[in-house]
């Protein structure tokens, strides 16, 4: 009888060590040192002694998981969410909000200080309540054949599997209260095996729900969903395709910002944390010190989150955005709020904005709010415009540091830095920086 050779699977034994953690990175991992290199520890906090299982050992760093806390930090708190140990939505519920904010501010300071070797201090932190803040969420839906049940929730940590959640304490209370009845009605649908995801949004006009379904819904399923929307007083949208949206009940959503009404589509980007967003916009207005003679350019303007409030104080404001649908919505909101001094344009922001017809008169103040990739291609154009003040709103401190260096080597100085705690209990770090021309 022929025998075939097969290589045996390499057996690896995880090393367990005891370390003292001295720092917390912006992602909520404890930082220690072992064998002359950094060790990032999930579940450990500064000043804690922990037993750690090494799960990854690289040349310059290692990663581990705290298996036992020998000496606990006074900043350690009990996670409020019953799903925290598995759900990948939050990473820092075991740390006090104060420690989370201080650690993110330190990380921001380090990244901004590194390029020039000069210490850049974070002036202050804009924050709000750490629970019940999230006004938007997308929940995955997955039917489990073995148990014949529907799972609804977020991805598991380091996995593509869904954690079936019954509550989420970071959601707005109105949305959190919908989770269990929503799961029940979705589980009762004939199409339960062919559902993609559900989006929940809490607008100032009320709650709304978007259901992505992969097959056509029966009349009975549609009736169930419509009855649910009336019972819970929410606007219902159905999405048979990723690029389609059918409104079944309710009105179009809107939110208030600085005495303005901003309407939006369920698929439009809005800031998740309304309280921090309101403070952020107010801070930007204060830093720009808007005067009646000012001409302001708002780059990556979206649907006018900053542009429209600025229009109340400046002579002219121009918002520029690459997505046509957002430009159209922003223009509609300008008309709705009778802001005749605000204009919106669609433009590829990698191209020279200073040469466009709407830029002929120039701008003395600029605000930009780019995506995570930053605005490297835009910075040279801003320098050509030569505004007196620039406010940079960032969702990625690494690209912020890179783009800041371009301004700092072109006659600008850094005046103020604020950390925005837009997403408590997560590793997301947002910030805003004020630059002025020397």
Curated annotation (Swiss-Prot):
Physiological role: Catalyzes the formation of 5-methyl-uridine at position 1939 (m5U1939) in 23S rRNA.
Swiss-Prot/TrEMBL catalytic activity: uridine(1939) in 23S rRNA + S-adenosyl-L-methionine = 5-methyluridine(1939) in 23S rRNA + S-adenosyl-L-homocysteine + H(+)
Annotated [4Fe-4S] cluster binding sites: 81, 87, 90, 168
Gene that produces this protein: rlmD
Keyword terms: 4Fe-4S, Iron, Iron-sulfur, Metal-binding, Methyltransferase, rRNA processing, S-adenosyl-L-methionine, Transferase
Pfam family, one: TRAM
BP-aspect Gene Ontology terms: rRNA base methylation
Annotated ranges, domain TRAM: 10-68
HAMAP family hit by this protein: 23SrRNA_methyltr_RlmD
An MF annotation (GO) of this entry: 4 iron, 4 sulfur cluster binding
Residues annotated as the enzyme's active site: 395 (nucleophile)
Organism lineage: Bacteria, Pseudomonadati, Pseudomonadota, Gammaproteobacteria, Enterobacterales
Record EC number: 2.1.1.190
InterPro entries (UniProt xref): 23S_rRNA_MeTrfase_RlmD, MeTrfase_TrmA_AS, MeTrfase_TrmA_CS, NA-bd_OB-fold, SAM-dependent_MTases_sf, TRAM_dom, U5_MeTrfase_fam
Family, as annotated: Belongs to the class I-like SAM-binding methyltransferase superfamily. RNA M5U methyltransferase family. RlmD subfamily.
Entry protein name: 23S rRNA (uracil(1939)-C(5))-methyltransferase RlmD
Residues annotated for S-adenosyl-L-methionine binding in this entry: 271, 300, 305, 321, 348, 369
CDD domains in UniProt: AdoMet_MTases
């Amino acid at each position: 009888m022929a025998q075939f050779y097969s290589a045996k699977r390499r057996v690896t034994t995880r090393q367990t060590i005891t370390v003292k953690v001295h720092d917390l990175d912006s992602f909520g991992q404890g930082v220690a040192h072992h064998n002359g290199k950094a060790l990032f520890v999930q579940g450990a906090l500064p000043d804690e002694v922990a037993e750690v299982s090494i799960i990854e050992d690289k040349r310059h760093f290692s990663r581990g998981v705290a298996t036992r806390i020998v000496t606990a930090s006074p900043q350690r708190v009990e996670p409020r969410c019953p799903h925290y140990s598995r759900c990948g939505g939050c990473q820092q519920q075991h740390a006090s909000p104060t420690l989370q904010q201080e650690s993110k501010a330190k990380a921001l300071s380090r990244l901004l200080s590194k390029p020039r070797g000069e210490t850049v201090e974070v002036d202050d932190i804009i924050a709000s309540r750490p629970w019940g803040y999230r006004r938007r969420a997308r929940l995955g839906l997955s039917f489990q054949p073995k148990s014949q049940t529907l799972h609804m929730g977020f991805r598991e940590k380091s996995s593509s599997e869904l954690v079936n959640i019954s509550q989420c304490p970071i959601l707005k209370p109105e949305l959190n209260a919908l989770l269990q009845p929503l799961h029940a009605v979705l589980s009762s649908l004939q199409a339960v095996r062919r559902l993609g995801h559900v989006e929940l949004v809490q607008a100032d006009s009320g709650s709304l729900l978007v259901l992505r379904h992969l097959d056509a819904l029966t009349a009975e399923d549609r009736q169930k969903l419509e009855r649910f929307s009336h019972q819970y007083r929410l606007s219902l949208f159905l999405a048979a395709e990723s690029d389609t949206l059918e409104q079944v009940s309710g009105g179009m959503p809107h939110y208030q910002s600085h005495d303005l009404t901003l309407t939006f589509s369920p698929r439009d980007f809005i800031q998740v944390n309304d309280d921090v967003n309101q403070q952020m916009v107010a801070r930007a207005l204060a830093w720009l010190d808007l005067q009646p003679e000012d001409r302001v350019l708002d780059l990556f303007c979206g649907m006018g989150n900053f542009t429209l409030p600025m229009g109340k104080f400046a002579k002219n404001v121009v918002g520029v955005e690459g997505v046509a649908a957002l430009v159209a919505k922003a223009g509609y909101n300008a008309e709705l709020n009778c802001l005749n001094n605000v204009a919106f344009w669609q433009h590829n922001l990698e191209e020279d904005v200073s040469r466009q017809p709407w830029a002929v008169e120039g701008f003395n103040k600029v605000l930009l709010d780019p995506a995570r990739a930053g605005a490297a291609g835009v910075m040279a154009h801003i320098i050509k415009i030569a505004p007196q003040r620039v406010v940079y709103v960032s969702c990625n401190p690494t690209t912020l540091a890179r783009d800041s260096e371009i301004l700092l080597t072109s006659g600008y100085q850094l005046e103020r830095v604020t950390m925005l705690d837009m997403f408590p209990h997560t590793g997301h770090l947002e910030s805003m920086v004020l630059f002025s021309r020397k």
